[in-house]
């Protein structure tokens, strides 16, 4: 029996070659280890997108992973650009590889925001490859003599030719040509297999992907498809047989692999953040501050300075009601800094990520000096003087840990970004585990006092965790772009990039692409795709559903294959998008750590790794997130500042930049939330939250914290909601598993809801340090390592035994910990969001017009469409007026009793819908109308057209929307007349023909008017559609939403309405929840799985529903359990678009 040779596969594409490879990186690595390969090189096309996933799996398998990429190179060989595989030999080579991939996507010498190229147009010139060849090994799958000579000149002994043997015509001639060129030019020739799949069974999917890439079908693809399944991973024995005539080719591949010693582990936690440079003696407390970017720091005298923000001393309430608007700092620079590259290292530079990563300890100490001074100033600002003793101790402890771990620059970077936002009047607030940090609180990053709330700092950072911290900051979503561009311009695009998000195939998209590739008709593909929701499992598509769609898998082999292949395709990457807010910022050029490419959105660049990739390598990121509610709150406060009530009003308006001044703990606010009057209120407007509210009956801020946390998948799956509510109602005794745990669980009535409680339980019951408790939480949450979990259990049980807890009791406590450590919600995160719950609820309670107006102007956001927000405002006594070219601004606004006039002090504000509500109307057209109206009101439609230079199309659009107001009160007449008006305001046929006789158009009915409103604006201020159609629904048989509350439990009932929300949460085991709106309110339907399957098309698609079922009552919570549903026949346009959540 012959001994198998050593062999390493050097050319391997994964699915991250985007439609070129048909296997996940993890599958390729696992199969390579199974086959006994000595190493595997992952070389995806123009990218390192999948390399971290492959690296993680290679660590688990113990397989050496070579980092590479297959670049499209222009100018290497005659004709079309050639493919060239580059493999990193060392850290320098890896940096060069990242630079070359970046160059391919961004072009030469990019400094601004490069334009995105189509994937087929991404290429790099050979001159750039030759210039960046150090530390790289080049593998060329060709035999052109001139190209081989050029490669040898550029790479020397670090170049080789690649040959393959796939049993196709003409292949042997190419192998002979390559071997001949190699001998002639002294270049080694290595055997490779140009791998596209990890197993032969994936070849069918590979063919489908090829068809998708070329926009063709399997019947028409021809030679674009591989003729066989030979491009799969093969073991050394199989290749030895295949290449028995050329064993030295296999040896060459193994030798090349031995030369490529770079491993991804080398960049773990490598890059510190760039410093935040502050001039000596220029700290807070009313003293002017200047900060400098790395680019500025490289140029002498490049400093910017502006007057500092005033530091308003204010002692926070027992439980802060809303985020503070200012911070312990000077102002941000007047404008973004230059983005020229420069090496940092000036005095005052912040520290990096630890000495192990090469941090300059002098720089770190300087950074800590700055951070300590800012914390001192911030503590005085937060507490109106010296902080309480317990706060001072906590701050000192946190700062010592931050210094020992080298994270000063991370805190300073986030502080700098938050400071910039506040200096521009952009509302922002930190959340997540960062709210456990007293340092973040006094720096103004977060708004929760963690000491007063008893939060654990180790949930945020611990020495035992060995991972970098993660600070999430929310900004107004409409102004976040200002913050993002500030980061780009301050640190330079070569040192800052947004984290990518990999958009993968889901059920619908997989079905559509596979169906088209297999040649199904567009109708068949459409019917298949409509069978499932976006995120539903294709395994749910059975014969019954296919029959509903007019398809039969038994009769159609292609339908069966479509379903099977679509299931395989689910989870494959389709393209890259932008992460919701993650930024990577580095001291050295970022493109030496990870390739950068332009994002689809202009002005943005992204790295080729997602957040999980960065986490795997312990690379720091800053999360700058957009939050619609912050936009709405900012807009509401600005509206109130402009329409301030009379000074004697009991609901004095807060300062527009100071949510913190909203009155805290208002009983009226809690009473409103307790009756589930929460449409538009942050986090508590969902159907589940509304069902919870009457049972929870919040009475204070901490009740809102619990409300935010309890309606989550974890507590629901853990069965914690009902025990907590029973104990709150006095129907169940409060019990504690171990008496000393009462202080930990008392606030949640003995029911563990928060991750911090799990950590404190381990500290008290087993003597864990807080850092060890956080490690326990992480092990229990992820449960990836049975060994770690077993070790933690042994440590926990031993600690409890030392405290007199018996083995049986200890086992029970461990089971409880295991049960809720993973699903528990972070208390700090819930508290941060609860601030916004209270602030938005206060505005809704006391200023419903301003609140509704702000919500309309902040769309898209929240749970409900504009129509539902308008109906809710009307139920709260707000007068709403429709779109009118004579009164409306571009956005919705507040006006007084006189149309188009601002409300006088003390006058009740009226909500005027803005021109932005008219579907399809460009903002430029709206602005032109406003500019023309500023010179005086319009006297006629012709004058409007002439002065605003409106085209006939836009005039007709406005007329259809009923927006011509007093100029043409009758909508039909307005549309008719608009069709005969030219852009200059004259009649189209004036002077060419006798005057047209007046046309007596029939008056539109109320139903026609409402239908036209919905068709053109998505909402109607005239009335609800159900009020118009109810008289024809059979008298009192069909109940209104308001009447449901008076019916007894299990009473048979029929209800009808407009579908405003559909939900099918994963935790509901197939149950669908539908919210129906009528003229009196909202009715909640519960559609069980069997009913849903029978009426799936109606439930999923009908805009209006008539439902029959029985009343389900639980206290004040009323639902309708549905037995059957039917579409309610109304005009197709008469309805808003439902918000569907799957």
Curated annotation (Swiss-Prot):
* Protein localization: Cytoplasm
Catalytic activity, EC: 2.7.7.7
Any one GO MF term held by the record is: 3'-5' exonuclease activity
Query: What Gene Ontology biological process does one annotation of this record name?
Result: DNA replication
Here the segments flagged for biased composition (Low complexity) are 311-320, 327-344
Tell me which UniProt keywords the record has, alphabetically: Cytoplasm, DNA damage, DNA repair, DNA replication, DNA-directed DNA polymerase, Nucleotidyltransferase, Transferase
Q: Which InterPro entries match?
A: DNA_pol3_alpha_NTPase_dom, DNA_pol3_alpha_thumb_dom, DNA_pol3_finger, DnaE2, DnaE2/DnaE/PolC, DNAPol_HHH, NA-bd_OB_tRNA, PHP_dom
Does this UniProt record's set of keywords contain Ligase? no
Q: Where is the composition biased (Gly residues)?
A: 345-355
Residues of the region (Disordered) are 291-361
Summarize the protein's role: DNA polymerase involved in damage-induced mutagenesis and translesion synthesis (TLS). It is not the major replicative DNA polymerase.
User: This protein is called what?
Assistant: Error-prone DNA polymerase
């Amino acid at each position: 029996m012959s001994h198998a040779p050593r062999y390493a596969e050097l050319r391997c594409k994964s699915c991250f070659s985007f439609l070129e490879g048909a296997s996940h990186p993890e599958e390729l690595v696992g199969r390579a280890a199974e086959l006994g390969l000595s190493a595997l090189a992952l070389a995806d096309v123009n990218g390192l997108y999948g390399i971290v996933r492959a690296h993680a799996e290679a660590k688990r398998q113990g397989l050496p992973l070579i980092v590479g990429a297959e670049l499209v190179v222009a100018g290497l060989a005659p004709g079309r650009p050639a493919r060239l595989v580059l493999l990193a030999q060392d850290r320098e080579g890896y940096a060069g590889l990242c630079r070359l991939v970046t160059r391919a996507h961004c072009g030469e010498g990019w400094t601004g925001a490069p334009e995105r190229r189509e994937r087929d147009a991404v290429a790099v010139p050979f001159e750039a490859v030759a210039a960046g060849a150090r530390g790289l090994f080049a593998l060329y799958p060709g035999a052109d003599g001139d190209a081989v000579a050029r490669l040898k000149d550029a790479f020397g002994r670090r170049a080789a030719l690649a040959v393959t043997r796939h049993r196709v015509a003409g292949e042997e001639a190419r192998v002979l040509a390559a071997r001949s060129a190699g001998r002639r030019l002294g270049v080694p020739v290595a055997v490779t297999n140009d791998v596209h799949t990890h197993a032969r069974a994936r070849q069918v999917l590979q063919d489908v992907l090829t068809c998708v890439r070329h926009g063709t079908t399997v019947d028409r693809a021809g030679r674009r498809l591989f003729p066989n399944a030979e491009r799969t991973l093969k073991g050394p024995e199989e290749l030895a047989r295949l290449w028995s005539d050329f064993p030295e080719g296999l040896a060459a591949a193994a030798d090349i692999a031995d030369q490529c010693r770079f491993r991804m582990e080398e960049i773990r936690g490598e890059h510190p953040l760039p410093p935040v440079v502050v001039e000596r003696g220029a700290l807070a407390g009313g003293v002017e501050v200047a900060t400098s970017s790395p680019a500025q720091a490289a140029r002498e005298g490049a400093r910017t300075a502006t007057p500092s923000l005033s530091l308003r001393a204010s002692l926070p309430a027992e439980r802060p009601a809303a985020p503070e608007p200012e911070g312990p700092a000077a102002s941000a620079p007047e404008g973004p800094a230059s983005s020229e590259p420069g090496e940092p290292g000036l005095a005052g530079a912040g520290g990096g990520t630890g000495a192990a990563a090469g941090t300059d300890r002098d720089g770190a100490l300087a950074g800590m000096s700055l951070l300590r001074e800012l914390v001192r100033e911030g503590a005085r600002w937060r507490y109106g003087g010296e902080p309480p003793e317990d706060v001072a101790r906590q701050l000192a402890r946190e700062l010592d840990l931050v210094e020992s771990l080298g994270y000063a620059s991370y805190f300073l970077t986030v502080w700098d970004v938050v400071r910039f936002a506040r200096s521009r009047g952009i509302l922002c607030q930190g959340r997540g585990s960062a709210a456990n940090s007293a340092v973040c609180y006094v720096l103004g990053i977060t708004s929760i006092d963690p000491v007063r709330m008893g939060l654990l700092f180790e949930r945020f950072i611990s020495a035992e965790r060995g991972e970098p911290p993660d600070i999430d900051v929310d900004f107004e979503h409409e102004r976040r772009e200002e913050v993002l561009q500030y980061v780009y311009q301050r640190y330079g695009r070569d040192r800052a990039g947004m984290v990518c998000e990999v958009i993968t195939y889901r059920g619908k998209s997989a079905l559509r692409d596979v169906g088209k590739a297999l040649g199904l008709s567009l109708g068949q593909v459409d019917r298949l795709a409509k069978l499932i929701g976006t995120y539903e499992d294709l395994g749910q598509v059975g014969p019954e559903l296919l029959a509903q769609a007019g398809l039969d898998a038994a009769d159609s082999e292609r339908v069966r294959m479509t379903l099977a292949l679509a299931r395989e395709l689910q989870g494959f990457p389709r393209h890259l998008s932008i992460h919701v807010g993650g930024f990577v910022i580095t001291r050295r050029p970022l493109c030496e750590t990870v390739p950068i490419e332009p994002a689809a959105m202009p002005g943005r660049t992204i790295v080729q790794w997602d957040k999980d990739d960065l986490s795997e390598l312990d690379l720091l990121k800053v999360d700058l997130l957009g939050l619609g509610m912050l936009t709405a709150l900012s807009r509401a406060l600005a509206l109130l500042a402009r329409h301030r009530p009379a000074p004697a009003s009991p609901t004095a308006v807060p300062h527009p930049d100071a949510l913190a001044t909203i009155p805290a703990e208002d009983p009226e606010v809690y009473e409103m939330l307790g009756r589930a009057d929460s449409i538009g209120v942050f986090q508590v407007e969902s159907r589940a939250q509304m069902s919870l509210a009457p049972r929870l009956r919040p009475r204070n801020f901490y009740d809102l914290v619990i409300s935010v946390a309890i309606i989550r998948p974890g507590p629901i799956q853990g069965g914690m909601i009902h025990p907590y509510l029973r104990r709150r109602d006095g129907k169940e005794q409060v019990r504690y598993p171990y008496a000393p745990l009462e202080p930990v669980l008392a606030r949640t009535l003995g029911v563990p809801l928060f991750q911090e409680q799990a950590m404190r339980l381990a500290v008290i019951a087993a003597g864990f340090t807080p850092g060890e408790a956080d490690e326990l939480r992480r092990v229990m949450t992820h449960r990836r390592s049975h060994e770690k979990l077993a070790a933690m259990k042994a440590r926990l049980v031993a600690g409890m035994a030392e405290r007199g807890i018996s083995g049986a009791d200890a086992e029970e406590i461990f089971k409880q910990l295991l049960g809720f450590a993973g699903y528990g919600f972070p208390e700090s995160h819930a508290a941060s969001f609860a601030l916004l719950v209270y602030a938005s609820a206060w505005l809704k309670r006391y200023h419903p017009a301003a609140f509704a107006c702000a919500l309309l102007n902040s769309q898209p956001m929240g749970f409900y469409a504009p129509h539902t927000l308008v109906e809710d405002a009307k139920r709260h006594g707000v007068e709403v007026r429709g779109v009118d070219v004579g009164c409306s601004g571009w956005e919705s606004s507040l006006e007084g009793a006189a149309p188009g006039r601002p409300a006088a002090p003390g006058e009740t504000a009226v909500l005027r819908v803005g021109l932005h509500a008219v579907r399809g109307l460009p903002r430029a057209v709206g602005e032109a109308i406003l500019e023309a109206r500023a010179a005086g009101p319009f006297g006629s439609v012709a004058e409007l057209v002439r002065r605003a230079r409106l085209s006939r199309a836009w005039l007709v659009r406005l007329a259809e929307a009923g927006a011509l107001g007093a100029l043409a009160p009758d909508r039909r007449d307005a549309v008719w007349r608009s069709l005969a008006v030219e852009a200059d305001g004259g009649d189209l046929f004036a002077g060419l023909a006798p005057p047209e006789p007046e046309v007596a158009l029939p008056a539109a009915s109320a139903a026609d008017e409402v239908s036209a409103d919905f068709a053109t604006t998505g909402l109607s201020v005239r009335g609800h559609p159900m009020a118009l159609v109810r008289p024809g629904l059979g008298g009192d048989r069909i109940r209104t939403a308001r009447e449901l509350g008076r019916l007894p439990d299990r009473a048979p009932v029929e209800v009808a309405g407009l579908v405003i929300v559909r939900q099918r949460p994963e935790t509901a085991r197939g149950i669908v929840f539908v919210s129906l709106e009528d003229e009196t309110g909202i009715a909640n339907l519960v559609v069980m799985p069997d009913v849903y399957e029978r009426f799936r098309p109606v439930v999923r698609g009908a805009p209006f529903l008539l439902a029959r079922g029985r009343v389900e009552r639980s206290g004040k919570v009323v639902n309708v359990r549905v037995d059957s549903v039917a579409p309610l026949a109304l005009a197709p346009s008469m309805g808003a678009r439902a918000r569907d959540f799957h």
